[in-house]
């Protein structure tokens, strides 16, 4: 029999970035909160199988491959199939444990309880938790946040066995580096792993039906990204749709393309999207359902069509980034308890941890032109900056977009090492309603990559002056 029920003002299902942030926000507002997760520690996919592991692997790849040193003209050893994976996994474990401790510490607040178990709705305001020891617990909630994340989509025709044909979870369990790897997909996960393994000396072939990877980004950035990937030795096959993949039973994986071609490699990573993790939740009992893509639909405040139930993070679909998930969880908690909201979705940066990094915030040149008729666009290439020449990061660039009349900053897109850090200057400019003149009227350290803002702003100012003269 289930144990006697407990009552909470908010029950959060899933302790990843979205759920974790929702719980903290509600607790800070003085609410009684229960945070539920199937794992023994908070963190979710982000810490255990997603963001933290892949980004740690990326940093290890940069270090072990000597890419930074090579860019500066320093000789390094070659990597390949003999590279020890144990050291990579050991470092990954240390980072995961440290972040788990951090997240655990953050929820040690008055009013927050953490429970391990698998949750399922039994009524609109009632959950039943299946506990690790076999018992059950009934929980009553005034409000709910569903933040159960997502899992890799596993097309049946790809014959994923998690040993030869992998998904984005099982690739983190490799015990050695393969000589070759086929990556199916062109989204964030596919692009990140393709460049990481190429940097580690694996021969990578990336295949997708789309014309370019990361199609939601500015084409200028993705064009440079592809050139960089190819310069590392990677192969990019655009406009080629994979229709099946199988292991030959001996030593190779065979990917068949729609045009009849076959691509052979030692292992294959299938990264053809993700789907919401809602199996077993019994959403129907709460009056919930998923849309045609398998995600839980929400409004701008993360509320579902059931008034007391919210959803946040990967479970609601794109952009499926940790930073946006955190803000969605925070937004859900603040809205349900009537707390003020100030954050705009356009001010949340996106970070893509490929090699090299890419990041953007605000709107693109294309979107700015649609909204304002035209746009001021300034570019700065790292090859023109003293810091870029010193570090050898000459492939990077920054693109700044501003209103044609006022010069108000509308967005920025960056490619290059440190892009995910540099983007925050543009984010602050957006939040503060600043103009391009701000970047020229203030002094930057020299030499730094942040100078790219000043260079790009000067180009925007020149365009603005030309427009004024023409009118």
Question: What is the predicted role of each segment?
Answer:
Residues 4-18, 177-187:
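Beta1/beta-strand and adjacent pyrophosphate-binding region of the FAD-binding site
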Residues 23, 27, 194, 198-199:
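Gly/Ala-rich phosphate-binding loop of Rossmann-like dinucleotide-binding domains
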Residues 14-19, 149, 185-190, 273, ...:
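Conserved phosphate-binding and hydrolysis motifs of nucleotide-dependent enzymes
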Residues 231, 257, 291, 298-300, ...:
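Short, acidic, Ser/Thr-enriched surface-loop or helix-capping motifs
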Residues 11-13, 119, 139-149, 183-184, ...:
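Short hydrophobic core segments
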Residues 161-177, 262-335, 429:
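FAD-site-proximal beta/loop scaffold in flavoenzymes
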Residues 8, 13-18, 22-39, 45, ...:
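Flexible, glycine-rich terminal cap/loop adjacent to redox cofactors
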Residues 2-8, 24-31, 37-177, 205, ...:
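Glycine-rich flavin
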């Amino acid at each position: 029999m289930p144990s006697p029920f407990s009552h909470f003002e908010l029950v959060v299902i899933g302790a990843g970035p979205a759920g974790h942030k929702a719980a903290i926000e509600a607790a800070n507002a003085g609410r009684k909160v229960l945070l539920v997760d199937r794992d023994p520690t908070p963190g979710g996919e982000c810490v255990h199988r997603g963001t933290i592991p892949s980004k740690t692997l990326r940093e290890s790849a940069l270090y072990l491959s000597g890419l930074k040193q090579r860019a500066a003209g320093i000789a390094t050893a070659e990597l390949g199939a003999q590279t020890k994976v144990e050291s990579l996994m050991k470092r990954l474990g240390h980072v995961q444990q440290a972040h788990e401790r951090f997240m655990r510490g953050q929820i040690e607040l008055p009013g927050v309880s953490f429970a391990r178990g698998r949750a399922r709705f039994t009524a609109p305001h009632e959950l039943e938790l299946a506990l690790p020891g076999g018992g059950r617990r009934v929980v009553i909630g005034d409000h709910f946040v569903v933040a159960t994340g997502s899992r890799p989509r596993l097309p049946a025709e790809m014959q994923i066995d998690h040993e030869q044909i992998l998904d984005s979870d099982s690739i983190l369990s490799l015990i050695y580096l393969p000589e070759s790897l086929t990556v199916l997909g062109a989204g964030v996960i596919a692009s990140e792993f393709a460049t990481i393994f190429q940097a580690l000396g694996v021969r990578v072939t990336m295949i997708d039906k789309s014309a370019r990877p990361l199609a939601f980004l500015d084409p200028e950035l993705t064009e440079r990204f592809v050139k960089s990937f190819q310069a590392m030795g990677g192969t990019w096959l655009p406009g080629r749709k994979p229709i099946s993949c199988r292991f030959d039973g001996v030593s190779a994986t065979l990917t068949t393309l729609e045009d009849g071609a076959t691509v052979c490699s030692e292992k294959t990573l299938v990264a053809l999207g993700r789907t919401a993790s809602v199996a077993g939740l019994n959403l129907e009992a709460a009056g919930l359902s998923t849309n045609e893509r398998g995600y839980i639909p929400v409004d701008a405040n993360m509320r579902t069509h059931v008034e007391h139930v919210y959803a946040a993070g990967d479970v609601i679909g794109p952009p499926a980034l940790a930073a946006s998930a955190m803000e969605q969880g925070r937004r859900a908690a603040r809205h349900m308890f009537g707390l003020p909201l100030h954050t705009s979705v356009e001010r949340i940066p996106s970070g893509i941890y490929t090699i090299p990094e890419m990041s953007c915030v605000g709107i693109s040149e294309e979107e700015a032109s649609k909204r304002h008729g035209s746009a001021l666009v300034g570019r700065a290439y790292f090859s023109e900056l003293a810091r870029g020449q010193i570090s050898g990061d000459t492939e990077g660039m920054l693109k700044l977009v501003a209103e044609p009349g006022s010069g108000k900053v509308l967005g920025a897109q960056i490619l290059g090492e440190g892009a995910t850090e540099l983007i925050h200057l543009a984010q602050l400019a957006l939040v503060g309603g600043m103009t391009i003149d701000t970047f020229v009227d203030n002094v930057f350290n020299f030499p730094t990559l942040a100078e790219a803002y000043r260079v790009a702003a000067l180009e925007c100012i020149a365009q603005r002056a030309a427009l004024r003269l023409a009118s």
